[in-house]
Amino acid sequence: MSHLVKMENGQSQTIQEMLGCIERYNPDHLKTLEAYVQDQAKNNTYDLEANLAVLKLYQFNPHMLNFDITYTILLKSLTSLPHTDFVMAKCLLLPQQMKDENVQTIIDLADILERADFTLFWQRAEVNRSMFRHIAGFHDSIRKFVSHVVGTTFQTIRKDLLKELLGGIEDSTLESWIKRNGWKHQGQGLVVVAMQDDKIKTKNITEKIEFDNVGGLMAQCL
């Protein structure tokens, strides 16, 4: 859905155009930006700059604070891990937002993800599933982050452990994630995450430098 922002002169701008000028701080545009946040949740899209602009407008206009939009922005920023979007969003929160129980729950979920305690995350996510039910693709976005961590941590991993880290998914769903990441079955319940030949190999390079090559440079430094 295309969101247009109505200017005082009667003309319209796209949200991206509006964010590039001083109009991004105009509270008259907040409702349009909030609707844009809701569309991101519904359509599995993401616009960090617009979402941060909403939080900044809340800072300037605390009386216009919308907690539901705040939750959605924070949860959408989690779907961007391992990028630092959540940290940036968190830094813009007002004291009353930080004191909110749901905000604290989301912050706890973020901490758990950053510690890579994925089993605990899925347990907490199940308890709080109503919080992000409206965010399309949320679970798969987190699984993408889990896959990133697994890919940088393991060479091989037990199939049952991988299934647990991805949220206790069905075998058919696990197979699709294995295929998506280019992993392979090894047998004996193991999944090959990274072949040894795929690992970057270090190489020592020795370069012989003659004194005549650097003598002039050293003389200039004296």
UniProtKB/Swiss-Prot annotation:
The UniProt entry lists the main location of this chain as: cytoplasm
What Pfam families would the database entry show? CSN8_PSD8_EIF3K (PF10075)
This protein's GO cellular component annotations are: eukaryotic 43S preinitiation complex; eukaryotic 48S preinitiation complex; eukaryotic translation initiation factor 3 complex
Q: Which UniProt keywords apply?
A: Cytoplasm, Initiation factor, Protein biosynthesis
GO MF assignments: ribosome binding; RNA binding; translation initiation factor activity
Q: Which BP terms in the Gene Ontology apply to this protein?
A: formation of cytoplasmic translation initiation complex; regulation of translational initiation
Q: Does the keyword Cell membrane apply?
A: no
Cited InterPro entries: ARM-type_fold, CSN8_PSD8_EIF3K, eIF3k, PCI_dom, Transl_init_fac_sub12_N_euk, WH-like_DNA-bd_sf, WH_DNA-bd_sf
Say which domain of life the source belongs to: Eukaryota
Where found, per UniProt?
A: Cytoplasm
Q: Where does the record place the PCI domain? A: 46-208
SUPFAM superfamilies recorded: ARM repeat (SSF48371), Winged helix' DNA-binding domain (SSF46785)
Described function:
Component of the eukaryotic translation initiation factor 3 (eIF-3) complex, which is involved in protein synthesis of a specialized repertoire of mRNAs and, together with other initiation factors, stimulates binding of mRNA and methionyl-tRNAi to the 40S ribosome. The eIF-3 complex specifically targets and initiates translation of a subset of mRNAs involved in cell proliferation.
Give the multimer and partner information. Answer: Component of the eukaryotic translation initiation factor 3 (eIF-3) complex. The eIF-3 complex interacts with pix.
Assigned protein family: Belongs to the eIF-3 subunit K family.
> What protein name is recorded for this chain?
Eukaryotic translation initiation factor 3 subunit K
